[in-house]
C-alpha cells in the first residue's frame, strides 16, 4: 500500500536552540496550545491529588508533562509554573526536604554521571507515592506526604493503619527521619510483562479515600533514604532490615560501572518482584548533611528509567494509502519516537471510517505501542490540538479491478500493483521495492503494469538514482521474469485465487483459463461461490483482457497461440 502525501495535511517542525524538536506554530497558536495543555495537566493533577483517582495513565501524564516543558522551552517560556508536582494542600513541614531524582536518558549519560563518583549503589525505582516517616522516642510520630518537597499533608492516621510499616523502632532508628515509597504489594510482579498497572494512582487513591482501612493492608514501604544515618551503607542497610525495612537491603547492590547498573536494571525488569518499578536509582553511599537537602538538588543520586511500553507521539501528517485491491488505509506520520530500540515514524490507523471515528489531525498527541512482530499500534488519542486541519480522503471508487493501467487518479494503486507483481508471491523481482518502481514509472511513464518489460538496458541505466550495478541487476531480473511460468504471471495480474487453488486448477495457458466455468472455480480449495464469481469478473474485465493480449504479443509463456 502506498501513501498519498501533502504538506498541507501536516505540521512543520523546527529545532530550537536547546535542540528540542519544536512545532513551527505561529506565536499565538503556540501560546494557546501551551496554555491548553498546561490547564489539562493541572486538572488531571488536581483530580489525582484531591480525589485519589487517575483520569489518565501515569505514563501518559508523565510524557505529556515532558512535552509541555519541551514546548515551553521552544518558545523561551519559564517552565517553573509547569503543573507536574502535587498541589500544596498540606502545611506540615518535612524535617528533611525531598530532593527528587534527576532522570538519565541512556547508558551513555549514566556513564557520564557515574564518572568521578564513588561508592555507588543501585536500587529499583519503586513506583508508588513518596512519604516521610518521623520516629521519635522509638515510636512513629508523623508521616508526611511528599507535597512540594518542603511541606506536605499529614498522613499519620492512615500510615498507622498500614501493617507493613513498623510503628516502633530501636537504637539509631528510635529517633530518625526516613524517606521512602509507599507501594502496592505484588506477588511475582514481572515489570516487562505486566507493566505499571497505574500503581502510583492506586496507592494515592487508597491513601486519600476515607473508610478504606482494609485496602491499606495491600500497601508496603521501601525506604530509599535515611538522612544523617550511618555513613557506611552496609551498616545503614543492616539496621533498616533489623527494624523491619528489609526490602531496602534485599534490593540494594554495589555497582562499579554502567554495565553493572544495566545488568541490575535488566534483571529487575524481567524478574518477579514484590512491587511495580519504573527503572533504577543509582546513589552514592556518601550523602551531604540533611540540612543541605533541597528539592531538585540531589546530585548524589540519579534515575535510569525503563523505556516506556507505549510512547506519546505527535502526529505530523495524515496520509492515505491505496492497496492493490483498492482498499484505502489511513496512516499517521509521527515525530519519531523510540520503542524497544525501534524508531517509529508512522502508525496504521485503519480505514477511513475508523480514522474519522478516532478524529485524529496533525498536531494531536497519540499513544503508540508495539504489537506482535514489532508493528506499531495506535492505542489512544491522549491530546487533541485546537486546530483541526484534516485532509480529504481520496475518492472511494477504487476496487480490485481498477488501476491496471496508469492514470493521474490511479497513481497510488498502480504503484501498489507494481510492488505486488515484483514480490515473491508473484514474479519475484529481487531488489525492486517501492522506491525503484516509483523511479522507473516517473522516468519512463508506464502505460500499464507490465510496461517495464519493454525497457532497454540503456533506459534502465539512465533512470535517476540507479547506479550501474543496480541497473544491471534490474535488467537481469526483468529478462528472467519472461521465463516465469504462466501461473506466476496471472498471480501478478492479481487473479483472486490462492496459489494452492491455481495449482489444483492445473491451467497452463490463458486459453485454458478462458474455458473454465464458474462451477469449476467453485470446486477449487478455499474458493467457493463468492470467490468463483470474482474470478469470472476478473477474467472478463477489459483491462485484464487487454493485458493478456499484450503479454501474448511479448511471447510470455501461456499467453501466445
Swiss-Prot record:
Family: Belongs to the NAD-dependent DNA ligase family. LigB subfamily.
Species in which this protein is naturally found: Salmonella newport (strain SL254)
Family annotation (SMART domains): LIGANc
Record flagged with keyword Transcription: no
Coiled coil: none
Function (record text): Catalyzes the formation of phosphodiester linkages between 5'-phosphoryl and 3'-hydroxyl groups in double-stranded DNA using NAD as a coenzyme and as the energy source for the reaction.
Domain of life: Bacteria
Enzyme class: ligase
The keyword Iron is assigned to this record: no
Protein name: DNA ligase B
A GO BP annotation: DNA repair
Keywords carried by this UniProt record: DNA damage, DNA repair, DNA replication, Ligase, NAD
Catalytic activity: NAD(+) + (deoxyribonucleotide)n-3'-hydroxyl + 5'-phospho-(deoxyribonucleotide)m = (deoxyribonucleotide)n+m + AMP + beta-nicotinamide D-nucleotide
Any Pfam family the entry gives: DNA_ligase_OB
Active-site annotation: 125
InterPro entries: DNA_ligase_AS, DNA_ligase_B, DNA_ligase_CS, DNAligase_adenylation, DNAligase_N, NA-bd_OB-fold, NAD_dep_DNA_ligaseB, NAD_DNA_ligase_OB
A molecular-function term among this protein's GO annotations: DNA ligase (NAD+) activity
EC number: 6.5.1.2
